[in-house]
Regions:
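Catalytic machinery of carbohydrate-active enzymes
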Residues: 1-419
C-alpha cells in the first residue's frame, strides 16, 4: 500500500525528530575521530544531491548541478524511484550515478534506505548536498551516508524545524529569492574554502539562473508528430503540424497539494475561449494515464471538436518532443511547468498556494497569481501543508486573465516562426 503524503509528514516529525537527536551525537563523534587522522576533502570530488519528493526540483536544481560539474565534481543523485524520470530530461547526472528509494511502502522505504547508505560508502561520496527544505529523513541520510562535507539548510535561531546538527556547512534558507538561487547558495557553501556563519555571503546574479535545453531525438519528435496528426485525423480535425498551432492545456496538479488546481470548469471555459479566438488550431488536454477521467471531464464540458483528450498519449521521455512541437501551454503550478522549461515552449502558469517569486518556471513562462493576503500559504515553515480547503487564490484567476496571457505567448511564438 502506498504511503500517503500526510503519513510521510507524520513519520518525518514524530520519528524523525527523536532519530535526529539520537544520531547527531554519533555523527559528531565519528567526525571527531576521523578528523584526528584525516582532514577530509580539500574540495568536493564526488558530490551527492538529495532531493526525494519533487520532480520539478530536478529541473530547478540543474543550474546548480552544472555549476558543481564545471568545478570538477562528479555528480550523484538520490531521489524517490517514482520521480527518477525527471532526471532524464537533461541527463546532467549519469544514469549509473542515480540512487533511488521506493516510497510505495514502509518495507520498500527501509530496504532501499539501508541499500543507499551502503552504496554511498561504496562509491566514497565525499560531499553531500541536502536540497530538501528541513526534512528530517534527508538530514539523517545526509548524516549517515559517509560524506565528510555535508551541506544543507539549517534553522539557526528559528523554531519548529530542528533536524539535528549533522551538517558541517549550514546554509541560511532565503524565502525571498527564487529556489534556484537558494540551490546555487548551497553550491557556494560546498566549495567555499572558508566557513561562513551563516552561508552564503554572496550575491547570486540572475545570469547564474541558466537552464540547458533538452536534446531532442529527431526520430522521437517525428513519432510524436505522427501520433498527434493521426489522432486529429481520426477525430476529423484538419491539422498539420507547423501549419495550425498546437495548444496544450494541463488541468491537473499532483495530490501533494490539490489546492493548486484551477477548477475543471474554468479550464473548460478557457478551451472554449481559445477555440473562439483560434478556431483552426488544435488543443490537446494533457495528463498522465491516471488522469484520463479528470481530463475527459474537462474535455466533455468544453465540448469543442478541436480539443482532444491527450492524457496518457505520450511517455515521460516524449514530453520534450511534445513541448517542442507545441506553441503554448497553460498549466497549474505543477511539474509540466518546469519540464517544459527545457524546451522553447511558451507557458502560462497559474499560481495560488505557492508563489512564482520562489517557484516560478525558469523557461519562457508568464506566471499568473491573484496576490491574495493569505498567499502563499505553503512554505518550508509548514512543510507545504496548508489548512486551506477553499482555494480562493485560484478561483480569483479569471478565464479572461489567462486568455490575455495566452494571446501574448502565441503572438511571441508567431514572431519567432516568422508569421
Amino acid at each position: 500500500m502506498a504511503i500517503s503524503v500526510n503519513t510521510m509528514r507524520a513519520i518525518d516529525h514524530w520519528v524523525g525528530v527523536p532519530l535526529c537527536a539520537l544520531i547527531s551525537p554519533v555523527v559528531a563523534l565519528m567526525d571527531g575521530i576521523q578528523n584526528i587522522f584525516t582532514s577530509g576533502p580539500h574540495k568536493p570530488k564526488k558530490l551527492l544531491f538529495i532531493e526525494l519528493s519533487e520532480m520539478g526540483s530536478a529541473i530547478l536544481v540543474d543550474p546548480a548541478m552544472r555549476n558543481a560539474q564545471a568545478r570538477g565534481a562528479e555528480l550523484y543523485f538520490l531521489i524517490f524511484k517514482s520521480n527518477r524520470a525527471s532526471l532524464t530530461l537533461l541527463n546532467t547526472v549519469k544514469s549509473e550515478n542515480i540512487f533511488t528509494i521506493d516510497s510505495s511502502s514502509i518495507s520498500g522505504l527501509i530496504k532501499d534506505t539501508l541499500s543507499f547508505l551502503i552504496l554511498a560508502r561504496r562509491h566514497r561520496i565525499d560531499t553531500v548536498i541536502d536540497l530538501e527544505l528541513f526534512s528530517r529523513f534527508t538530514a539523517i541520510l545526509t548524516g549517515l551516508c559517509g560524506a565528510r562535507r555535508r551541506v544543507g539548510y539549517h534553522i539557526f535561531h528559528g523554531e519548529g524545524l530542528w533536524r539535528g546538527f549533522m551538517l558541517t556547512r549550514k546554509v541560511h534558507y532565503n524565502p525571498h529569492i527564487h529556489i534556484t538561487k537558494n540551490f546555487l547558495s548551497l553550491i557556494h557553501a560546498a566549495f567555499a574554502t572558508e566557513i561562513e556563519v551563516p552561508f552564503s555571503k554572496i550575491q547570486i546574479p540572475d545570469s547564474e539562473v541558466r537552464l540547458e535545453q533538452a536534446v531532442i531525438n529527431p526520430t522521437v519528435l517525428e513519432t510524436v508528430r505522427t501520433r498527434i496528426e493521426k489522432l486529429a485525423k481520426e477525430s476529423d480535425i484538419a491539422f498539420t503540424s507547423g501549419k495550425e498551432r498546437l495548444i496544450l492545456i494541463n488541468p491537473n496538479a499532483s495530490d501533494l497539494l490539490p489546492q493548486r488546481r484551477w477548477a475543471q470548469q474554468r479550464f473548460s471555459e478557457l478551451i472554449q475561449a481559445i477555440h473562439q479566438r483560434y478556431p483552426h488550431d488544435l488543443i490537446l488536454i494533457t495528463g498522465s494515464p491516471a488522469e484520463f477521467n479528470y481530463v475527459e471531464k474537462v474535455r466533455s464540458v468544453a465540448n469543442i471538436k478541436n480539443a482532444l483528450n491527450f492524457a496518457g498519449q505520450v511517455s515521460f521521455a516524449e514530453l520534450p518532443p511534445l513541448y517542442t512541437l507545441s506553441d503554448v501551454m497553460v498549466t497549474n503550478d505543477s511539474g509540466p511547468g518546469h519540464f517544459s522549461a527545457v524546451t522553447p515552449l511558451r507557458t502560462v502558469v497559474l499560481f495560488g498556494p505557492e508563489t512564482p517569486a520562489l517557484y516560478g518556471s525558469i523557461g519562457n513562462s508568464i506566471p499568473i497569481t491573484a496576490n491574495l493576503a493569505c498567499s502563499p500559504c505553503v512554505s518550508a515553515a509548514n512543510h507545504r501543508k496548508t489548512p486551506c480547503n477553499d482555494n480562493v487564490c485560484m478561483q480569483a484567476i479569471t478565464v479572461t486573465q489567462v486568455l490575455d496571457k495566452v494571446n501574448l505567448q502565441l503572438e511571441s511564438a508567431d514572431k519567432t516562426k516568422g508569421y
